[in-house]
Amino acid sequence: MRSPQALLQGDPEIAGLINKELERQQSHLELIASENFASPAVMAAQGSVLTNKYAEGLPNRRYYGGCEHVDAIEELAIERAKQLFGAAWANVQPHSGAQANFAVFLALLKPGDTILGMDLSHGGHLTHGSPVNVSGKWFKAVHYGVDPETQQLNLESIRQLALEHKPKLIVCGYSAYPRSIDFAGFRAIADEVGAYLLADMAHIAGLVAAGVHPSPVPHCHVVTTTTHKTLRGPRGGLILCNDADFAKQFDKAVFPGTQGGPLEHVVAAKAVAFGEALQPSFKQYSQQVVANAQALAERLQERGIAVVSGGTDNHVVLLDLRGIGMTGKVADLLVSEVNITANKNTVPFDPESPFVTSGLRLGTAALTTRGFDEAAFSEVADVIADRLLNPEDAAIEQRCRDRVASLCQRHPLYGPASPVLAA
């Protein structure tokens, strides 16, 4: 079955728009930290006939017939996830990281319970108690931040907050924190106050799987993640734990607690991605992701642009633009004009609103998939610096655009395996 050709013939309008998106991805430098490029194999699994199958329930315990093959696929996804992260149990059904987090909340908490998570403006996530999210509406949310001097986590200050507020759940794991996380230290705090510990490793899951970032699995009561970002799979969620009693609660919280039928085509794509991440080449890839982020941070600082915490231990580089008198909103627009995709982001103790911000968040996972190395990322840093430091210079703007085009041509996306739809 030639799906690209079928789409081209069946709906040329959608096919044309997909082609335009492919061209955009090929011709732009993707630096959004939460994005990556899934392999053709992952995309093939997600676009398969599994789209047609309903399969409410768990493998071998379904509410529908005809599930023998999706059972085998989901069991394989579960086993690969357990092997990849060294966990005793996994649920591969959550549709997203947010769904995974909410399933954990449903299993462990009651409305009004206290949760302790990182402040969104310091690098946390909406689902960790933000007042605009259900996690902040249904539960009493207390937030910790980073140290004002080091811009890194201070476990003693977090411990004092925990002792004061006695949370039922502590959340660690973030969306814009560039440093390594001491999961054992967090577990000690959780045990001291009698709290559950949830690690949301959505951003660093691939690095954890490859062993280039400490794993939360041995230390936390439960771990959630997305399956894209650094893990390079389809967009989806995953829950892991080592406790059989918790596992039963989490299974019920996913179905029927928060979801109906799982997306078995996405589950298959997750299984493919987990299989890819179990290969030795994925460890090399993940090591390169971190090396590239450190090269990017180092060169940007050499060019006079501040980096939050002075560097990075993972794939995230968070720029603090206050020193050059620029907002994140303006910087986001400036780099987009030379075909670099990033996102404005708050920085710790940011005086600007979340709609303006003082920061620009960069990530290295996607371009590392395209084969970028440290030298290429140093060049990327120069392009960014040239653009941000010379916003009114049309000649420099064009030169930046030309350098982006050259970098993209030297590091093609997908190449012969391109999922292009055009005839």
Swiss-Prot record:
Gene Ontology biological process terms, A to Z: glycine biosynthetic process from serine; tetrahydrofolate interconversion
Annotated site (Plays an important role in substrate specificity): 228
Modified residues (N6-(pyridoxal phosphate)lysine): 229
UniProt EC number: 2.1.2.1
Pathways per UniProt: One-carbon metabolism; tetrahydrofolate interconversion; Amino-acid biosynthesis; glycine biosynthesis; glycine from L-serine: step 1/1
Localization: Cytoplasm
Record keywords: Amino-acid biosynthesis, Cytoplasm, One-carbon metabolism, Pyridoxal phosphate, Transferase
GO CC annotation, single: cytosol
Gene Ontology MF terms in the entry: glycine hydroxymethyltransferase activity; pyridoxal phosphate binding
Gene3D superfamilies per UniProt: Aspartate Aminotransferase, domain 1 (3.90.1150.10), Type I PLP-dependent aspartate aminotransferase-like (Major domain) (3.40.640.10)
Reaction catalysed by this enzyme: (6R)-5,10-methylene-5,6,7,8-tetrahydrofolate + glycine + H2O = (6S)-5,6,7,8-tetrahydrofolate + L-serine
Keyword Amino-acid biosynthesis in annotation: yes
Annotated SUPFAM superfamilies: PLP-dependent transferases
Chief location of this protein within or outside the cell: cytoplasm
Required co-factors: pyridoxal 5'-phosphate
Classification via Pfam families: SHMT
Function: Catalyzes the reversible interconversion of serine and glycine with tetrahydrofolate (THF) serving as the one-carbon carrier. This reaction serves as the major source of one-carbon groups required for the biosynthesis of purines, thymidylate, methionine, and other important biomolecules. Also exhibits THF-independent aldolase activity toward beta-hydroxyamino acids, producing glycine and aldehydes, via a retro-aldol mechanism.
PANTHER family linked: SERINE HYDROXYMETHYLTRANSFERASE, SERINE HYDROXYMETHYLTRANSFERASE 1
Subunit structure and binding partners: Homodimer.
Family, per entry: Belongs to the SHMT family.
This protein's name: Serine hydroxymethyltransferase
Source species: Synechococcus sp. (strain RCC307)
